[in-house]
């Protein structure tokens, strides 16, 4: 349902430009991935599940690199690579407190100075998402979009 992407599209229009690199943590069927690719210079998407839709998307667009595996394994194996740095990190993996917190903490070192951290499912349905974000960024303003996407400027 494309209406579910209205908020992410608003986020992209407001904050993403065609010089930016994005790390997407959790791609599922690649619907949000395709939208991120439309706006950004380059998108690296990580997911532990392999979906044919992602393979088809990777063939269709020239600015997507999909990495299959666990977030921690892929990030740890690439963390010394200076080219594995991002202007925006979009977190949409598991939605419980522990996983959201871990996803944010392991990805933050990959964020370029002045980069943006964002994600999905900031809603009462997933209280762990909000709890982890507020704990890690206690003094940051959180911008919430209509599809429950969220964004923090990492100043």
Task: Outline where the language-model segments fall.
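S-adenosylmethionine/decaboxylated-SAM
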Residues: 2-155
